[in-house]
Amino acid sequence: MAVASQRRTIQFAIALGACCALSALGFLGAQSAPPRETARVSDRRIVRTVPDRLPQMLPPARAAGSWPSFRGSEASGVAEGQNLPDKWNVRRGENILWRTTIPGLAHSSPVIWGDLLFVTSAVSSNPAATFRPGLYGDGDASDDRTRQRWMVYALDKRTGKILWERVAYEGQPIDKRHIKSTYASATPATDGRIVVAWFGSQGVFAYDVNGNLRWKVDLGRIDVGAYDIPSFEWGPASSPIIWNDLVILQCDTQADSFVIALNVQSGETVWKTPREELPSWGTPTVVTTSAGAMLVTNASNFIRGYDPQTGRELWKLGGSSKITAPTPVFKDGLFVIASGRQPEGPIFVVRQNAKGDVTLAAGKTNSEAIAWSRIARGPYMPTPLIYRGLVYVLNNNGIFDAYNLGTGEEVYRQRLPNIGSGFSASPVGADGKIYLSSEDGEISVISAGTKFTQISTNDMGETLMATPALSEGVLYARTAKNVFAIGRKK
């Protein structure tokens, strides 16, 4: 492979907030009914373990302030009615409601249901284990192969008190991780009765909200890394989502890629759809369209739309980057799906009625199915934000763009000041403001609208890789060592 090609490949530094899976432990348990499978998958093992039978749980009503998975409901990143402060000061405690130290390393984001906040972490037996933030081209794996404890924590979101913590898995990592990543980069998901954590090749683990293990599933090895240099193991970051009674996971690996839906209460496979894909890091999205529910995944060979009930492919779109990380988002009948690796680096805006192969013809930027597109403008890590009629695109190098959602017209392009180590966390929006979190730990508050206006910059004092969560007037920021609750003191 040419040196230039290798250099372009290793520029990927997986650090999503994010964001995958269980190792061979001789797990027991049989499925009560065969899963639907759209095509034969090779020998990948899927093994389910269920502890002593626990009662079935009815799905709760959506609790106030819920932020159930990566970037909240439908990955929108938006929560209105928050009345958040524009400024806070960690050192002086101004507008800091609480902070709680979480051991270990993780880029996973907090998720919230009611008064419960869940986070994950991987705690190394080597207290010096770390990761390296920043804008650089190294594609090396970390030398941290020490014994880990993969943890799930439940906190009281009002006080920050740790209510329970569980060791989901303990052992030496099956795969390596990128020097910028952690062994817990996938964000958990919850529906108010179950919280699901995915730890790559270590497994998928489901607890009830009281900390009882409900089930765990071995999906086999989740080998995610450079598509053209297999020895570059970077680790997963795609996060689980819960839709109705399904836990949906996107498993794009060096071989045998697939999307799978598990029963949320039992872990049984409901459907599994194989696909020819390169490794990817984006989280899938399920939204309600005019034609019903649709599951959309971002990946290298094709961006795809599926029926989330069955896993049947509805449409596909070629032309994406060889490395994909941002999550699809949806608003006003339009999907925004993007990726930043050059030379493609596209932003695609797909109409909700897309069917079949909707790949654009050479030289075309729109079609019946594609409202508009742009090449070499996509973000590398952060997921775009659709907010109040505009699409905001934050790249890891600090370039911040705004486009008209309906037309694709560029509203502005702004280089953020003092970008430092760059950006991995995705923007979130509330009450006409946008919150941008840098790897150096600065959260900038930007006015939403057609003119770029920076209101404030707030230093968290720590590296920040995870996307914040918003709930009932509080911004929850997960830094390298702590979870912070930021809000107006009453």
Language-model features: where?
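Noncatalytic, solvent-exposed loop/strand surfaces
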Residues: 2-17, 22-490
